[in-house]
A protein has these predicted regions:
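A short acidic, Gly/Pro-enriched loop at the edge of an enzyme's catalytic core
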Residues: 116-126
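Conserved class I S-adenosyl-L-methionine
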Residues: 155-200
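A short glycine-rich, Lys/Arg-flanked "PGG" loop and its adjoining helix->strand segment in the class I
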Residues: 140-155
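A short SAM/SAH-binding and catalytic strip from SAM-dependent methyltransferases
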Residues: 124-140
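Class I SAM-dependent methyltransferase SAM/SAH-binding core
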Residues: 57-116
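Short alpha-helix
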Residues: 214-237
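Conserved alpha-helix/loop element of class I SAM-dependent methyltransferases that forms part
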Residues: 31-58
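N-terminal, positively charged/glycine-rich alpha-helical extensions of SAM-dependent methyltransferases
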Residues: 1-37
């Protein structure tokens, strides 16, 4: 397990406290709609194509938060484990699964300690993404950890917000047009970005404390290189102009229930999906 310097460890601890504070608010937000929104609705259509049949397969969802997506794997017949570094998130996820009548094993652990917490070569599929990688300072260690979790022949399925989405500013400044502009780094390499806000991406009350958190930018090239160097065979890469919520006013709802830019706007990637397989035999 990687050991970070004190500066990075302090940032990870701040993130942990921040997500502990967020969890109860998120669990009761209209954004997540727990108890009302179908867990399947959090997935783009191409995800089920790429994931294939899940019945009886061992699936782990890393950085699972409240488990809204984790539940969908259980509904598909998989034997599911969810892992998150926030003990409050894990507690809320356990409650949500219990109320839904689903059997899911939730584990409180950091991603970098996942092998120690869960065991090596245990899973057929590792699933993660949609706001996960930006909280990881080291993708090389993440990719190696993911490879160790998988059985030979298993695969990682990463569905993550495109770095272009994170680089585009969602807020119009005074005197500006409504055109989207680049406000943040697309590429990584300049360290963590500090953010301090009393509100998160959901509706609900303000955070009473622990508003400070840190994010790391990771370009697609950095992700692909980390996985290739960890021994993965890279398969399908999908870019899509879809999002599971309305990020900007110019977005319109699709037939699937997700959101995309209106037809009069340029098309650009908002989410990407990457399937990477662990070889059956190491070379």
């Amino acid at each position: 397990m990687v050991v970070f310097g004190e500066d990075v460890q302090a940032k990870i601890r701040a993130n942990n406290r921040n997500w502990d504070a967020r969890a109860p608010i998120h669990a009761r937000s209209r954004f997540y709609g727990i108890g009302d929104r179908d867990p399947m609705s959090w997935f783009a259509p191409f995800e089920w194509r790429d994931l294939g049949r899940l019945d009886g397969r061992e699936v782990v969802h890393l950085q699972c938060h409240l488990g809204v997506e984790t539940m969908a794997f259980a509904l598909k017949g998989a034997r599911v484990t969810g892992l998150d570094f926030s003990c409050v998130c894990v507690r809320e996820a356990q409650r949500v699964a219990r109320e839904a009548g689903l059997t899911i094993d939730y584990v409180h652990a950091d991603v970098y300690g996942a092998v120690e917490a869960l065991g090596a070569e245990r899973f057929d599929i590792v699933y993660t993404g949609k706001g996960a990688l930006c909280y990881l300072p080291d993708l090389t260690e993440w990719a190696q950890t993911t490879a160790r979790l998988l059985k030979p022949g298993g695969f990682l399925y990463l569905v993550e917000f495109h770095p272009l989405l994170n680089a585009l500013g969602p807020i119009q400044r005074p005197g500006e047009t409504r055109d989207l502009v680049i406000r943040r780094d697309y590429l990584g390499g300049r360290g963590a970005v500090e953010r301090d806000s009393t509100h998160t991406y959901t509706d609900g009350p303000a955070l009473a404390s622990d508003t400070l958190h840190y994010e790391w930018s990771h370009g697609v090239g950095e992700v692909v290189t980390a996985l290739a160097e960890a021994g993965f065979s890279l398969g399908r890469l999908t870019e899509t102009c879809l999002l599971p919520w309305q990020r900007w006013p110019a977005m319109v709802r699709t037939q699937h229930g997700w959101w995309t830019m209106s037809p009069s706007e340029p098309r650009f990637p908002l989410i990407y999906g990457l399937k990477a397989s662990k070889p059956t035999r190491l070379k």
